[in-house]
């Protein structure tokens, strides 16, 4: 039979109750956080998030919170670490599909659906933010969106961002895809698409799956040809952005446009 703590006031006696033990690898449920003992310090990710905010958590821990609990034989934190390592970055995770997630033995359809839903929310939020922005005068205004869309692709993608006369976003679309070493880009097709969108200005971008962002001689030649072709139809090429894994290169910032 349990007895009260006779040497302590009732409130302190109640506060001295230990939190129930949690199995290893399981994120603590919210209802377990309602009563905390005096001197308690947050250790688990959810506890630290509630105490200090999401910035206090690592990427692995944020992913672990999304997963919730581990599958039998698969620790949730180990699964989160493997995901971040496998996809190399959070941008890589945002590009992953449900099949990519379910290829990991620690993730089933339910957890895969949860991850895909969160990444799609992030993608839509960035798109909304880009549409709500003030006129765009630099590549930095759409850089995050471009990195999210094409930065983690294992193949090269050439994309165009169409802007109106006030440099507000009209649309963004992929023009072409290619191999790791070769991609065919036709300036006349980009000019045609700019006219279809009734664009007054354009930002083009392509990714380097290798991670290096230094433009090649062919990148510079293509940019000059595209600049001149767009000028013939009164469309201004504002920038050409090269996107790596964690860095970008702007032709405009380098003074090449």
Curated annotation (Swiss-Prot):
Sequence motif JAMM motif, location on chain: 206-219
UniProt: Zn(2+) binding residues: 206, 208, 219
Positions in coiled-coil regions: none
Alphabetic keyword roster: Hydrolase, Metal-binding, Metalloprotease, Protease, Zinc
Region ranges (Disordered): 1-28
UniProt KW Protease keyword: yes
Gene Ontology MF, one: metal ion binding
Alphabetized Pfam families for the sequence: RadC, UPF0758_N
GO biological process terms on file: proteolysis
Residue ranges occupied by any MPN domain in the UniProt entry: 135-257
InterPro entries found in the cross-reference section: MPN, RadC_JAB, RuvA_2-like, UPF0758, UPF0758_CS, UPF0758_N
Lineage: superkingdom: Bacteria
Residues annotated as transmembrane: none
Keyword Hydrolase: yes
UniProt-listed PANTHER family: DNA REPAIR PROTEIN RADC, UPF0758 PROTEIN YEES-RELATED
Similarity annotation: Belongs to the UPF0758 family.
Protein name: UPF0758 protein Bcep18194_A5833
Source organism: Burkholderia lata (strain ATCC 17760 / DSM 23089 / LMG 22485 / NCIMB 9086 / R18194 / 383)
Lineage: Bacteria, Pseudomonadati, Pseudomonadota, Betaproteobacteria, Burkholderiales
């Amino acid at each position: 039979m349990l007895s009260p703590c006779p040497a302590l006031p009732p409130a302190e006696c109640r506060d001295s109750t230990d939190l129930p033990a949690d199995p290893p690898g399981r994120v603590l449920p919210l209802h377990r956080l309602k009563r905390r003992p005096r001197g308690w310090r947050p250790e688990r990710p959810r506890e630290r998030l509630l105490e200090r905010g999401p910035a206090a958590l690592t990427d692995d821990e944020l992913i672990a919170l999304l997963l919730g609990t581990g599958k039998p034989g698969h620790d949730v934190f180990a699964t989160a670490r493997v995901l971040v390592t496998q996809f190399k970055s959070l941008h890589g995770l945002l590009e992953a599909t449900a099949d990519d997630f379910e290829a990991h033995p620690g993730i089933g359809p339910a957890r895969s659906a949860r991850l895909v839903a969160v990444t799609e929310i992030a993608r839509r939020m960035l798109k909304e933010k880009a549409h709500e922005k003030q006129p765009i005068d630099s590549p930095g205004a759409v850089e995050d969106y471009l990195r999210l869309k094409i930065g983690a692709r294992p193949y090269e993608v050439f994309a165009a961002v169409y802007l109106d006369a006030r440099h507000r976003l009209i649309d963004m679309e992929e023009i072409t895809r290619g191999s790791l070493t070769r991609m065919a880009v036709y300036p006349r097709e980009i000019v045609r698409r700019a006219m279809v969108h009734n664009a007054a200005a354009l930002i083009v971008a392509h990714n380097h799956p290798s991670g290096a962002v230094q433009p090649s001689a062919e990148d510079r030649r293509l940019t000059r040809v595209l600049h001149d072709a767009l000028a013939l139809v009164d469309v201004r090429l504002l920038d050409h952005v090269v996107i790596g894994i964690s860095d970008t290169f702007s032709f405009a910032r380098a003074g090449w446009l």
